[in-house]
């Protein structure tokens, strides 16, 4: 099956405080976006990637990904993440009309191992309509009331943190976005809303989401 990947990277990432769009923040000399796209490439399973970038940063993003030019298309993203995914999906279907599997990947998860990408693709190819990589929750989880007082301790044995890339049969993702509203942060959640089944594969600790300056410092320390 032909596999395409979408990277919605039009956000500004103000929490990172780097003065540039989060996707272009460098870690050890290479941007988060470049590392994320390279991981998709190195999986050996993705035919093409479409990046949705800030409209005024498209030339900069194209320059950043110049070494992967034949593998990547860059399109202007939208005001919301859902807009960017829709725009990237339309471009992916234009560029690779026979695509049957689509991945949606966060540039902020720049260190996701290629093996995780392969596992997600394999699960979709084997029949799962939607797949997410997950890790067990390590922290104790408390449920609180409106005043902030603890109501109960949640059984964490069935809880998982979700990573990316999330994988989908392309028609399933298309249907989910056709039914979606304007704002959503989790693509698999949209599949859940239309009654679709979402399966899991093991994630990886290296696929942490880089959101704050502290996260960035951790990533730099790991690479040092």
Curated annotation (Swiss-Prot):
Entry EC number(s): 2.7.7.60
One Gene Ontology biological process: isopentenyl diphosphate biosynthetic process, methylerythritol 4-phosphate pathway
Sites marked Positions MEP for the nucleophilic attack: 156, 209
InterPro entries: IspD, IspD/TarI, IspD/TarI_cytidylyltransf_bact, ISPD_synthase_CS, Nucleotide-diphossugar_trans
Keywords assigned: Isoprene biosynthesis, Nucleotidyltransferase, Transferase
Database matches in Pfam families: IspD (PF01128)
Catalytic activity: 2-C-methyl-D-erythritol 4-phosphate + CTP + H(+) = 4-CDP-2-C-methyl-D-erythritol + diphosphate
Enzyme class: transferase
GO MF annotation: an example: 2-C-methyl-D-erythritol 4-phosphate cytidylyltransferase activity
Involved pathway(s): Isoprenoid biosynthesis; isopentenyl diphosphate biosynthesis via DXP pathway; isopentenyl diphosphate from 1-deoxy-D-xylulose 5-phosphate: step 2/6
Cysteine pairs bridged by disulfides in the record: none
Source domain of life: Bacteria
Keyword Secreted annotated: no
CDD domains named in the record: CDP-ME_synthetase
Residue numbers marked as site, Transition state stabilizer: 15, 22
Function according to Swiss-Prot or TrEMBL: Catalyzes the formation of 4-diphosphocytidyl-2-C-methyl-D-erythritol from CTP and 2-C-methyl-D-erythritol 4-phosphate (MEP).
Entry similarity comment: Belongs to the IspD/TarI cytidylyltransferase family. IspD subfamily.
Name of the protein this chain belongs to: 2-C-methyl-D-erythritol 4-phosphate cytidylyltransferase
Species this chain originates from: Saccharopolyspora erythraea (strain ATCC 11635 / DSM 40517 / JCM 4748 / NBRC 13426 / NCIMB 8594 / NRRL 2338)
């Amino acid at each position: 099956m032909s596999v395409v990947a979408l990277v919605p990277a039009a956000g500004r990432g103000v929490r990172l405080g780097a003065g540039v769009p989060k996707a272009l923040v460098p870690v050890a000399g290479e941007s988060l976006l470049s590392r994320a796209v390279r991981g998709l490439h190195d999986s050996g399973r993705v035919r093409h990637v479409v990046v949705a970038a800030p409209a005024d940063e498209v030339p900069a993003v194209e320059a950043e990904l110049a070494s992967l030019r034949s593998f990547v298309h860059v399109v202007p993203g939208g005001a919301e993440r859902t807009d960017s995914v829709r725009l990237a999906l339309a471009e992916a279907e234009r560029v690779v009309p026979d695509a049957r599997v689509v991945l949606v990947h966060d540039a902020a998860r720049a260190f996701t191992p290629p093996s995780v990408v392969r596992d997600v693709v394999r699960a979709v190819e084997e029949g799962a309509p939607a797949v997410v990589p997950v890790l067990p929750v390590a922290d104790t989880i408390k449920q609180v009331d409106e005043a902030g007082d603890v109501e109960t301790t949640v059984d964490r044995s069935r809880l998982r943190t979700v990573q990316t890339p999330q994988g989908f049969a392309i028609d399933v993702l298309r249907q989910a976005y056709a039914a979606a509203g304007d704002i959503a942060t989790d693509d698999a959640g949209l599949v859940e809303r239309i009654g679709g089944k979402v399966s899991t594969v093991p994630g990886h600790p290296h696929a942490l989401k880089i959101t704050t300056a502290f996260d960035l410092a951790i990533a730099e320390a790991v690479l040092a």
